[in-house]
Amino acid sequence: MHTLGMHVRRIREAAGITLEELARRSGLSFRGVVYIEHGKRNPSLTTLLNLARGLDIEPSRLLEVFDAARREPIESPKSDPE
């Protein structure tokens, strides 16, 4: 599954931006950026816009991934046949 955090990380690394630099540019905490990249935090719309600013990209590049992830069906646990 392609997550928003993975997308943020790819863009950040391709741009040669460190985690610390992205945090500073976007006004987020270092830990907050790490949590987003590792899928441990679901960012708000405001945070997505701040990340886009920090990455110097159009917000739509992040919003597309965010929207696609939101529409993915949630898998239910498979039960063991008895």
Please identify what each model-predicted range represents:
Residues R10, A14, G54-I57, A68:
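Conserved amphipathic alpha-helical interaction elements at protein-protein interfaces in regulatory
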Residues M6-R25, N50, P77:
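Short basic helix-loop element that most often maps to the first helix and adjoining turn
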Residues G27-R41:
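Recognition helix of helix-turn-helix/homeodomain-like DNA-binding domains
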Residues V8, L22-A23, V33-I36, L62:
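Conserved hydrophobic/aromatic packing and binding residues within compact polymer-binding modules
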Residues L63-E82:
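Short, charged recognition helix plus adjacent turn
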Residues G27, T46-R61:
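DNA major-groove recognition helix of helix-turn-helix/homeodomain DNA-binding modules
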Residues Y35, G39, N50, A68:
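Alpha-helical DNA-recognition elements
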